[in-house]
Every structure is written in structure tokens, then in C-alpha cells.
Amino acid sequence: MPSHQLYSNDFELISHHLRLLQGCQALELDTLAGVLSGEILVQNHCYRADEMANMIELSKEFDYKITAFHHAVEAYKIADLLADEGICGALWADWWGFKHEAYDMVPANIAIVDQARSGKGCAIVHSDDEVGIQHLNHD
């Protein structure tokens, strides 16, 4: 059974509980409710193209929007899909290969994502390194 079908049962159960709790505040469900209502923007951490494609499939099934994929070293492989879905990539300029899932990057990753679908792509350069962030203008 595909994983999204397994989650479907959980989603139905959560939806049922939300209906029962109308008028009550269920703090543990506030974030999920915010995502489903569009109030919370989803910033998803993924390295690999297959992970991003799976998350896009889940977002369509459960009707929520992914705003950006962070790190996304394989975003160039699905750049057109990201552009079609209006999903940005918050990408490293030149930091990859430090672990298995961050191995398959190309130096043109940012450019490919940004120029997908004749410039309709969305790519921003970021760093989560305290030294690297100070020198992004050199990358």
C-alpha cells in the first residue's frame, strides 16, 4: 500500500476529531490545521528529487501548499515540476557531497531551478552555516 494511502486514514481520523472538537482548542492539532487552511506556509527540508516529488504528491492529496524546499540539492532534476507548482528552492550555492543524500548536485542547480519554464522558476541562495552566510555575495 502506498504511503499516501496510509496517511489518508490518519487524515480522516484527524478531520473527524476536528469536527468533534469544534469550540474546543486542540493545541496539538493547531499546526496541522494552519497548514491545511493555508495560514502556515510549509517550508520543507528535502535533498533528493524523489523526496520532493513525493511531498508534492502528498500536498496535492491533502490539499495544502508547499512554499519552498530547503537545501534541495537535486532540485535541478525536477526544476520544471517545481516551477509548475509554484514552489521555490532555498538552495546552497556550492555545498554538497557531505552525506549520501546530498551527493548528486550540480553547480548550476540554482540557475536551472530559477530559469525553469522560461524563467518561471524560483530559487534563492541560502546558507545555514554561520560563516557561509557572511560570504554569500561571493558564492
Please provide the spans of the model-predicted regions.
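Polyanionic/metal-chelating signatures
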Residues: 1-68
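Amphipathic coiled-coil/heptad-repeat helices and related helical stalk/stem segments
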Residues: 28, 51, 75, 106-109
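His/Asp/Glu-enriched, well-ordered alpha-helical/loop segment
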Residues: 41, 80-83, 87-139
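Active-site environment of divalent metal-dependent phosphoester hydrolases
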Residues: 49-53, 72-79, 131-133
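Distinct, well-ordered alpha-helical segments
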Residues: 52-60, 78-83, 139
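Short hydrophobic/aromatic-enriched beta-strand-loop microsegments
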Residues: 64-71, 88-93
